[in-house]
């Protein structure tokens, strides 16, 4: 007999998930509130914009993305935030998630479909099939000059203020601007 078989492990996993799912609305509300307070502390820093949200009501608030005029400013801001003790900050291009050239199955054109869709479809025969870094220069530029700051699910007001002030000061510091 395999470990866990006959031990109702599926029921245990379901019971734990059921309890965790009930907590989800509070966790999301807290992250949204933390993100809103941090954005309020930041105000409207010159030369920096917030990522446009196409569905603000659907944003759960797990991170804050700031967009700079150039890659150097983003890099310097991450360095300054790290120097100030903020560890959960990255240039978006280095974060790794959900960026086309980091999705191996997309770059390699590996399909879940046995038919190889969409790459093997006759309708796509004329399409350019390159998803390596550099295939989308406008997106690449955006990724390179954006930073992502993760928002933990249970920040206290003191932590929100400290993070907000560190970001505000780092964005406004001469080292981040030049």
Tell me the role of every PLM-derived stretch.
Residues 1-178:
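PLP-dependent aminotransferase class I/II
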